[in-house]
Amino acid sequence: SFRALSFCQSALANGHQIINVFFYQDGVTNSNALTCPASDEIDMHSNWQSLSSQHSIPLTNCVSAALRRGVLSPQDATENGKPQWNSSDAFTMGGLGELVVGIEQADRLISF
């Protein structure tokens, strides 16, 4: 995740546009608002949120991967009868359809 974030920051600094970041498999854990990294570790969740808010970049979680890993939005928690959620507002849940739309809109796909 750090490599992906660094790549995004570098791409933006060099004038490129990022239209969406799609998190899949273990990448969905970046949206978990309840992570508490040690003081000498990078807070990936906060860094992704900052990138999104500073550059208006949508952050999309694969909903299937997120649910399998216990990462829930408020809607997912309600639909699955869970009393709590842990995905922050900066991240939305979506399916592979959102990934396909992003691929169609972009001139390239970078995968980490």
What do these predicted regions represent?
Residues 27-41:
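N-terminal beta-loop-helix "entrance" segment that forms/cooperates
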Residues 15-19, 55-57, 105-107:
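Short coil/turn connectors at secondary-structure junctions
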Residues 63-112:
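N-terminal glycine-rich phosphate/adenylate-binding segment common to multiple enzyme folds
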Residues 37-66:
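A glycine-rich helix N-cap at a beta->alpha junction
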Residues 25-28, 65-66:
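Short beta-alpha junction loops
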